[in-house]
Amino acid sequence: MCSYVAKTLNVSLAEAYKFQKSYFREYGTSLKGLMENHKIDPFDYLDYVHEIDLSIIEKDEKLGSALTKLPGRKIVFTNAATPYAKKVLKKLGIANHFEAIFDIVDANFIPKPEPKVYQQIVAKYNISCETTTMVEDILKNLGPAAEMGMTTVWVNTNKPWSKNNSDGILPDVVIEDLSSWLLGVANA
């Protein structure tokens, strides 16, 4: 990502890193900041940053088993692009568990946690907020879901970026192991 920013803005990698982190914090995604401040082509950016080695991702049998047992609809809501999300889901061996992917392109490049994006996904898929659970690894992205009446689950990865700009957001559930939690819910 930093190499794209450095090349596109003609700055050093160190300067590109500062831009990338600043835009991520301010706009929710680096992409949105680059679009707002530098008028970059979002498709060019997405093609570049999602062309990464996914060999470290392994099939997750436990997660697949949990999703199989879990009733209800499952929709991916991501600030990434659908082709990338599909690659990750396929590597994990769980692609068949999801009926749809709502990505940054569907959202007109407006990232989570912008409330209107949550309204878009709810309308597009006729989601009942009162019976929906949103699982997320970035805490601030749960704020709008909670305000709409969804149950919120934060997967605490213990990464500093996962808590940025999240003051006052209290998820219903905090977990560290998604597969175990889902199995517990499915077996309850």
Where are these regions (language model features)?
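Short, contiguous strand/loop micro-motifs
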Residues: 17-19, 50-54, 72, 104-105, ...
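A short, Lys/Arg-enriched amphipathic alpha-helix followed by its capping loop at the start of a domain
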Residues: 62-74
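Short glycine/serine/threonine/alanine-rich loop segments
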Residues: 11, 40, 72, 127, ...
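Asp-based, Mg2+/Mn2+-dependent phosphohydrolase catalytic module
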Residues: 68, 81-188
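Short, flexible active-site loop motifs that bind/organize anionic cofactors or intermediates
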Residues: 6, 24, 35, 53, ...
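N-terminal start-of-chain detector that recognizes signal peptides
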Residues: 5-7, 46-49, 73-75, 105-106, ...
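N-terminal helical cap/lid subdomain that shapes the substrate entry/recognition surface
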Residues: 1-64, 83
